[in-house]
């Protein structure tokens, strides 16, 4: 038995069958029930021509079905593909096609979008619709109802042997603004991103230890606040399923701090996983409300992945949760979990500071690891258990996954310094990526959407500081002669091209866009305009 995620979670289910695994609204399922339903779904998929190596899209809100679909894919050596439910039709088509989806499990609400996209994806041959609180007609997408499909499957675990080399793909934003699929081997993902399935102990040396740990360790109840379509929440869920914990999912489509704190009290949540200030600030403010009477006594850890806390928000939360430990983790889709923040950040530190192991380094211009304490800025890199590359993108793979001086490194573009004590200070992305509430937004895609408006001659998009979201999207626009452009008009137009969180919240009109001699936008100039000019502004991400 290798370190395969399906094998490991099945072994945990056998070790603690009657233990609750997932809570979602009024639905509570044990490990045995979760495994049985995933097994039934896996057999249904096999019976309908979906099997080893096929890609299964999960176009779902947070739900038990999301986890069932993930586990079912693992069982048959297929690959679950996360789909951002905020995508509009053009973005969905790109992802469906780029990911070579053979099947899609979607919420009923999304049937019209699936109907619009599916005919343009030649290899897509199975659609399953999960019931929700809408009355959308699933016949428009020719989808099969999910529950009868699951019920029809066998409960036998008579699947083909699996491998630690089975594939897991996580789609994330690309440098051109389009999503790209990060390919991980199961075994590498387990140790690089999922803490070996033992978040508060040593990683396992044998596969059997995962179930042993799950049975013997204390049960930890975890609440991943972010959507499961994001790696931060998906990995949190897998970590605690592997460790025999209990996962609490929020049963709403929108971020609701009041509901989250009520769930914390009702389910005695121990660990909360969030995405930086975008979630941390509203959660802190909810606790600070006059008359707030939430029971947070069970919480002993609050973690942030995908975006770090600011010191101010961390202090707000600490004041309300004095007995909790606050953990920023750094890494990402390409790097996994590379380290955790130091307890106290020095006041003069130019960025958040983290502890890391020997697999993480800061590389100089010659791609050699910098020694501690030089004060030099370099590229954050990781070696060892890292992804295979990007799916169907050898060019970007070659740029991000590099061979240098006998080592293979993943270099995602973060700039950093290695301090005298060996800790890592993160300085930010070397690219122009905008991080709004943990969502990666790439200017080129939004610029293309803006330029497709009849009144826009040219446009540059940058991120500007935002107290809640970390950054918000600002557009610097040159209108066509005789034309005018308003924020409201561009907002409505962009929403037909890109997801809502990518739409500019500020508009700065200029006589002419400044570009470099190469023709590339001058982002430094654009940031100065966006930071110094009066803005027509809207809300956050």
Question: Model-found features: residue ranges?
Answer:
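Conserved AMP-binding/adenylate-forming core of the ANL superfamily
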Residues: 10, 18-63, 67, 71, ...
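Conserved pre-ATP/AMP-binding loop-to-beta segment of ANL
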Residues: 17, 152-171, 177-178, 212-221
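Conserved AMP-binding A3 loop
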Residues: 30-32, 167-195, 200-203
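Structural core segment of the AMP-binding/adenylate-forming
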Residues: 47-48, 75-148
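AMP-binding/adenylate-forming catalytic core of the ANL superfamily
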Residues: 87, 93-96, 104-106, 262-265, ...
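Gly/Ser/Thr-rich phosphate-binding loop
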Residues: 147, 174, 242-245, 269-274, ...
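Conserved AMP-binding/adenylation subdomain of ANL enzymes
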Residues: 190-224, 229-271
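Conserved ATP/PPi-binding loop(s) of AMP-dependent carboxylate-activating enzymes
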Residues: 355, 368-401, 439-441
